[in-house]
Amino acid sequence: MSQFFEYKDTIKEGDLVLAWLSRDNLKPITVKAGEVFNTRYGAFSHSDMIGKPFGSQIAIRTKGSNRFGFIHVLQPTPELWSISLPHRTQIVYTPDSSYIMQRMECNPRSRVIEAGTGSGSFSHAFARSAGHLFSYEFHEVRYEQAKQEFKEHGLLEAGNTTITHRDVCKDGFEIKNGDTTSHEFRGPEETKVELNADCIFLDLPAPWDAIPNLTSVISKEKKVNLCCFSPCIEQVDKTLEALEEEGWQDVQTVEIQGRQYEARRQMVRRLDDAIERLRDVKRRKHEGVEKRQKNVEQTSNNGSSVEATESDKDLKHTEKTHFNPFGKGSRVKEGDSNFEWTQVSKVELEIKSHTSFLTFASKIIDRTRDEEQTKAYLATFKDEGSKLSKREQRRLKAQANKDIQKE
């Protein structure tokens, strides 16, 4: 069983662990006895990790000093893997992937098509949640890298993940015996895989070319949900046209923007405190001037060799005052009950997730409907509505689909 599907208590040799260096810096490690993991915090022996519970802190003493460096060793999950994985392409981060899976109603009985494996970030999330994942990658080098990665992580061994080397825009989604794929065929040479997919995720430069090829591989028994991941609004526009031409319904485009908030407590600063501070500065200024004048008078009367007076020492070492929220003073721990505090927060300026437009649609195959008649009916609107706005054309096409279903 894959480490991404179930939790383990302790680390064993050969396990994949994620070394937590900071919130945005995680490093994947395959634990091997005798090897060393080098970081700016020091060198950590893999042997020290074996037998420790996941989540443990591994600490070492820095040579030549009393300072300690440490890391945390974590259980790999799809969410943490998306932060630490080696990037071969842009990836789908957790803020997007979690929303996509919820909207597509992905569950352990779902059969998912993912076109555009890329770095495999979303593939791990699908493999954990879905009944079976069919992933496609057109780039041969990335296909081999992803296949090896899935094998090492136990996704192929679990039997619910199939990755195929294919350009789905040109060659479609059907998997047959003889194709370059991780699926193990048994039986005659003409054997092909029954996909019956009910969740479709397209992360492609031109998803509108792949949408017509979905007809033969989607489920005929239940509702099919689709999501297209497109960085540019021009891609969204062409995708919407393709979805409507193929009879997809409930089309909606959204964008997810996730920012983190840093929350802390800040001491309440009042006007009386500011006025008192100004008075204190003015009072100390006058006292300093008076002490300096006395010192000058004593020096002129007793000669230049007179040692520093007590007043000089007082000027160099002024007594510390109580805490001043507007200036220097005694240190106060955040949240001290002797002072009044208020809750404040600050949002990070940059959006670190890869933001794109998410276009959702759904389809239910009506076996009683004549698909040829449907396309001919929609073609009349395409010809008559060529001078209309795109929004009006979409409205007419949607109305045509409803009229056909009533017939």
UniProtKB/Swiss-Prot annotation:
SUPFAM superfamilies: S-adenosyl-L-methionine-dependent methyltransferases (SSF53335). Gene3D superfamilies: 3.10.330.20, Vaccinia Virus protein VP39. The keyword Hydrolase does not apply. GO terms for molecular function: tRNA (adenine(58)-N1)-methyltransferase activity. Its EC number is 2.1.1.220. Residues 284-335, 388-407 are annotated as: Disordered. It is an enzyme of class 2 (transferase). Residues 296-308 have a biased composition (Polar residues). Its main location: nucleus. GO terms for cellular component: nucleus; tRNA (m1A) methyltransferase complex. It is found in: Nucleus. It comes from the Eukaryota. Residues 310-322 have a biased composition (Basic and acidic residues). Keywords: Methyltransferase, Nucleus, S-adenosyl-L-methionine, Transferase, tRNA processing. S-adenosyl-L-methionine binds at residues 119-121, 137, 142, 167-168, 203. One of its GO terms (biological process) is tRNA methylation. It catalyses: adenosine(58) in tRNA + S-adenosyl-L-methionine = N(1)-methyladenosine(58) in tRNA + S-adenosyl-L-homocysteine + H(+). Signal peptide: none annotated. Belongs to the class I-like SAM-binding methyltransferase superfamily. TRM61 family. Catalytic subunit of tRNA (adenine-N(1)-)-methyltransferase, which catalyzes the formation of N(1)-methyladenine at position 58 (m1A58) in initiator methionyl-tRNA. Heterotetramer; composed of two copies of TRM6 and two copies of TRM61. This is tRNA (adenine(58)-N(1))-methyltransferase catalytic subunit TRM61. It comes from Kluyveromyces lactis (strain ATCC 8585 / CBS 2359 / DSM 70799 / NBRC 1267 / NRRL Y-1140 / WM37).
